[in-house]
Amino acid sequence: MLCQFSFKNFKSYKDETVFDMQAANLPEFAENIIYCKPASNLLPVAAIYGPNGGGKTNMLQALTCLISTVVKPIYDMEKTRTKLIVQQKVSCTPFLFDEKTSNEPTEFLLYFRTNGYEYRYYLSMLHDEIIAEALDRKKIGGKRTAHVFDREEKVITLGSSINKASINRDVNPKMPYLSFLAINYDIPAINDAQKWFESCIIRSYANTEAELQIMLSDNKTIRRQIISALNDMGIDINGYRYDNDSKQLIMQRTLHGKTYELSYKDESDGTKKLIAALPILLIALAEGRLAVIDELDAKLHPKLLRYIIALFKNPKLNTHGAQLIFTSHDIATMKNTVYRRDEIWFAAEGDNHSSELYSLYEIRKENNERINNTAAYDKQYLEGRYGADPYLQNMLKDGEWQ
């Protein structure tokens, strides 16, 4: 599970930016968080809003960049330990609107939990070369942190959990040492960290191959869940198959006792989007994975988006700590009946063309009080009260077109 992610000098983000999935002490939806006693509780969902060009996608790309940098060398060497589902490579690009930062490293810091431990992974990159890297871990709820390894350019130090005598410290400057160790050695702490990175789902709607593989697999439970979820959302499908001749996914419906078939390509855009998204979301729920999806709401009715959010926020369905992080323009879903205040995030362009990221929970009113959990989040957002100025406020001021 993802606890916290921070990064600096990546694309539109110049300064250190922190994205936190640790649940704040809030009264609303207390029953829907992921309880992790004795450690801090975590959020199952986070939605990022903001204007086009504000930095929503770049925030997800920062996380994707870190994950793919670790996973790609392992995948290329066919040493993966977990089935990859739609991971994509994102290059490491610094903030370019400043002569200084354009030649400085990009930094990432990630806290995540897996297999009874909380890990801290740090990576500093200058374009595609590793400048510094470190991995530490401690037992969940524990106080003592164990050093796994530390890397400062060519100098690598190993912690007590690694048999130093048998470990090669000569590594390609473009390869993370975490990836190098995962490829060449069998080290429990490295294996656990590697499996977590590989389990992350990074969604690209340009590629539906992974979804087809899941839908057409022999896993009867997943097939049944996909059909059941589609039915729950008002899409009356009772089966599907793949036609090898036409290379098309065929959706099956029964009407008055007769089965009719319709090609996937002939379904509505919203139905196609939902069919494409559901398999990976159900896999994430079943296996406790992190799913990262850009513009999840595109072409989806708000009711369908709320259904997907509710799947992850339901502790009876989300029994393995699955998490969903996505960007959205769907203001109709920005409601106090859908989200906690710490589950809503905003990305907006600040000074010097640099993006800023903050949660609704962090915002203070003029009297220094937080936004109330009974507030009309969507209305106040459109009024520009949350700082991530939506286009409506910029176009219309004092009742006049600007």
Region locations from a protein language model:
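Pre-Walker A-like glycine/lysine-rich segment at the N-terminus of P-loop NTPase domains
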Residues: L2-S68
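Extended helical coiled-coil dimerization/tether regions that scaffold
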Residues: K8, S204-D266, K272, Y377, ...
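Conserved ABC ATPase signature
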Residues: V45-Y49, Y242-L282, L290-K303
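Electropositive, glycine-dotted interaction segments
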Residues: T114-Y242
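Conserved D-loop/post-Walker B switch-helix segment of ABC ATPase nucleotide-binding domains
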Residues: K303-A310
